Amino acid sequence: MVKNSFISVIPQEEKNKGSVEFQVFSFTNKIRKLTSHLELHRKDYSSQIGLRRILGKRQRLLAYLSKKNRVRYKELIDQLGIREPKTR
């Protein structure tokens, strides 16, 4: 399973499924699944709303992690292959 492959990559003390890194990883997987679903079903508006909601949650978690621990934030962004959000 995808979650188990990520858990083996992160350090032993961070195997907590409630950790910020794991939550961001989980949201990223959901985002990728919803994106591929929406490519086939463009008019699925409830899925679009769900995607926007998950994107917002992930963005808030990434902002929190970047404030608390910039090194872990950079590692996570590189590992997941997501862009750093634009700052205002």
Curated annotation (Swiss-Prot):
GO terms for cellular component: chloroplast; ribonucleoprotein complex; ribosome. One of its GO terms (biological process) is translation. It is found in: Plastid, Chloroplast. PROSITE patterns: RIBOSOMAL_S15. One of its GO terms (molecular function) is structural constituent of ribosome. Gene3D superfamilies: S15/NS1, RNA-binding (1.10.287.10). InterPro entries: Ribosomal_uS15 (IPR000589), Ribosomal_uS15_bac-type (IPR005290), uS15_NS1_RNA-bd_sf (IPR009068). Pfam families: Ribosomal_S15 (PF00312). The keyword Ribonucleoprotein applies. CDD domains: Ribosomal_S15p_S13e (cd00353). Keywords: Chloroplast, Plastid, Ribonucleoprotein, Ribosomal protein. Belongs to the universal ribosomal protein uS15 family. PANTHER family: RIBOSOMAL PROTEIN S15, BACTERIAL AND ORGANELLAR (PTHR23321), SMALL RIBOSOMAL SUBUNIT PROTEIN US15M (PTHR23321:SF26). Part of the 30S ribosomal subunit. HAMAP family: Ribosomal_uS15_B. This is Small ribosomal subunit protein uS15c.
